[in-house]
């Protein structure tokens, strides 16, 4: 008699999913995303080939790149894609593992909800677990870079490269990455030492083998001088950085000038030329001997620049000029007009560098800005057989540079190869049993979820994951149960997987290291993303509005 109103009556156009269904859907979406990148984890991970709608091909191993090229429709899936991009932006590496951990945490949380554990309890448990994990990682697992020396920096870069296309030449490239980061060392206003990744410019040149790549001290611009009559080297450079056109100034469209004397027409033309020439003169009079601009330069202006013995480069990338301006202390100007509307150029706008020179790499020429005043910069010129491998090399290099930066700034590293995850897993299992509340179930599941990393690593290396993970757990359990005095057993905490030989080894001695900051960030981000999705219990999707049909549609 009293019928419960159907849910559909509330929404005229759309669907409402709630309770278990929405959780299952979310888990399904996140697992699908994690499965896409799962097989690319680790030193023997495989690459993915992505073809977009116009047919552009990308071959990559980088989790963030793979996910950003996918067109994900499900909102829960989008959360994971954003998570990978965030990790890429903040740390640069660990994008694949962060997605895998988040998806696994969510899957296990969903199983608990099915067993009648309230999501809030699970969330509290996860938060407790991450707090303990972070504490254990910083106190016990991480070791300082100073105690391991510069070698450890190279090892950190090698570990980051091991899964990438340049993994075979990791000795060569890791040294290059470390040297590049050390050469751009700078300190900010608070006196903290910083290593800006953006100060390292990466150029790609086709041809030769990847081992012929070079690290150049100075900022390399993929441009050439505007005229062959110019100098190709300027010492003690004073650099003007412009984002404006030095072509002849044409009158704006729609301007009508009525003249009754042909001489006046000639005067107008002369004036058009003179305006730009005056601009160039102002810049040269301020002491500039190198002019870099994003737009074109007129031939007449080039003549006066050549006569002044200066150097000009046109059509540079704006992003490059922004970085050069920052490094040399110049101001990037988009117009010479000051607040009064008069055109001026002051010498304070100029940046300074020891020299600006045009050099030749294989068949390509590029401009190098060396010895910039504000902070030094470095450039890496990558060589490779084709565009796909060069793009992938650039991504791998970026990851390695970011990892070296994080290691230098935080000064702490942890062993790689699944060592951290296994150690945390054992620690959290023991911690869970010490609790009496329901949260212990969530913490135990959290501990199990972390083992997905060593398992996936082993599976990708075509090794027996069950056996290797069990061995690894045994080592870490022995380490955590050992007496403080038993140094040998305590040292087992650094044991991780050696995936090439399928054995367990001390990864600190083997040089498989990762910045502890990367691990901390990825764990925290994974838990936050998982909790965000876990809190969702209803999803309401509205249908797109239907446009009323035009009755005159066929009559036009």
UniProtKB/Swiss-Prot annotation:
The entry's keywords: ATP-binding, Chaperone, Cytoplasm, Nucleotide-binding
Protein name: T-complex protein 1 subunit alpha
Subunit-level organization: Heterooligomeric complex of about 850 to 900 kDa that forms two stacked rings, 12 to 16 nm in diameter.
Localization annotation: Cytoplasm
Main localization (coarse): cytoplasm
Gene that encodes the chain: cct1
Disulfide bridge positions per record: none
Keyword Cell membrane in annotation: no
GO cellular component: chaperonin-containing T-complex; cytoskeleton; cytosol; nucleus
């Amino acid at each position: 008699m009293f019928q419960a109103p159907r849910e559909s009556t509330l929404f005229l156009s759309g669907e409402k999913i709630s309770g278990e269904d929405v959780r299952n859907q979310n888990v399904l979406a996140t697992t699908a995303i994690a499965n896409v990148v799962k097989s690319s984890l680790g030193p023997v991970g495989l690459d993915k080939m992505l073809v977009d709608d116009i047919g552009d091909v990308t071959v990559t191993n980088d989790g963030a790149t793979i996910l950003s090229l996918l067109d994900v429709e499900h909102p829960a899936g989008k959360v994971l894609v954003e998570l990978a991009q965030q990790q890429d932006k903040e740390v640069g590496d660990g994008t694949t593992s962060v997605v895998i951990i988040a998806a696994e945490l969510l899957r296990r949380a969903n199983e608990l909800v099915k067993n009648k554990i309230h999501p809030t309890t699970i969330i509290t448990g996860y938060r407790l677990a991450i707090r303990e994990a972070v504490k254990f990682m910083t106190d016990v697992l991480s070791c300082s870079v100073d105690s391991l020396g510069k070698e450890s920096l190279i090892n950190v870069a090698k570990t980051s490269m091991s899964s990438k296309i340049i993994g075979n030449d990791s000795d060569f490239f890791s040294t290059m990455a470390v040297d590049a980061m050390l050469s751009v060392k700078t300190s900010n206003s608070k006196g903290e030492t910083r290593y800006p990744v953006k100060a390292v410019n990466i150029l790609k040149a086709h041809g030769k083998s990847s081992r012929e790549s070079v690290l150049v001290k100075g900022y390399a611009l993929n441009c050439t001088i505007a005229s062959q009559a110019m100098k190709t080297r300027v010492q003690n450079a004073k650099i003007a950085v412009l984002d404006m056109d030095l072509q002849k100034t044409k009158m704006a469209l729609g301007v009508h000038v009525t003249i009754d004397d042909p001489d006046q027409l000639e005067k107008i033309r002369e004036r058009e030329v003179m305006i730009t020439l005056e601009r160039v003169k102002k810049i040269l009079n301020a002491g500039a001997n190198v002019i870099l601009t994003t737009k074109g330069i007129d031939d007449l202006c080039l003549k006066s620049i050549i006569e002044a013995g200066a150097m000009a480069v046109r059509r540079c990338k704006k992003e490059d000029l922004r970085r050069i301006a920052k490094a040399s202390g110049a101001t990037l100007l988009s117009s010479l007009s000051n607040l009064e509307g008069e055109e001026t150029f002051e010498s304070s706008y100029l940046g300074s560098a020891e020299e600006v020179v045009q050099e030749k790499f294989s068949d390509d020429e590029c401009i190098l800005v060396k010895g910039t005043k504000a902070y030094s910069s470095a450039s890496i010129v990558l060589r490779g057989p084709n565009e796909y491998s060069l793009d992938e090399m650039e991504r791998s290099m970026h990851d390695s540079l970011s990892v070296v930066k994080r290691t230098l700034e935080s000064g702490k590293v942890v062993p790689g190869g699944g060592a951290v995850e296994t150690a945390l897993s054992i620690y959290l299992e023991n911690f869970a049993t010490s609790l009496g509340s329901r949260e212990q179930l969530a913490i135990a599941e959290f501990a199990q979820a972390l083992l997905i990393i060593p398992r996936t690593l082993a599976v990708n290396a075509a090794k027996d994951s069950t056996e290797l993970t069990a061995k690894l757990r045994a080592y870490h359990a022995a380490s955590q149960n050992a007496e403080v005095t038993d140094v040998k057993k305590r040292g087992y905490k650094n044991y991780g997987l050696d995936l090439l030989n399928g054995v367990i080894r001390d990864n600190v001695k083997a040089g498989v290291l990762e910045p502890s900051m990367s691990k901390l960030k990825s764990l925290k981000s994974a838990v936050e993303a998982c909790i965000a999705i876990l809190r969702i219990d209803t999803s309401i999707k509205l249908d797109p509005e239907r446009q009323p049909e035009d009755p005159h549609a066929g009559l036009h």
